[in-house]
């Protein structure tokens, strides 16, 4: 079984409409990039002032277990409101050799390169599966 593409979403207020809006933005982004299915890890009603959140902890465990190849987040504030916490988490993701895509940072050439590589890889894997 291949590695999953994950998305992490978080809202501080327990508002299902806001959470669904965040997920929809990530889904649209993934579709625009030619990315297949995305597994969501969502913390609804959790503060971004620390990293102690159930879905984020499950995502971390899955990354450490080698189950995740890419993580998509809408913006860094979804990970943490404290920029230092957010960067510590992003460094951990990088150390685990997981690609991180931040949707609302499209002008970053590294992000563009990752998205292009990921889209090409996903299409190649899809073609292999169809021709198997």
Give the positions of each predicted feature.
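Short, structured surface patches at the beginning of a domain
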Residues: 1-132
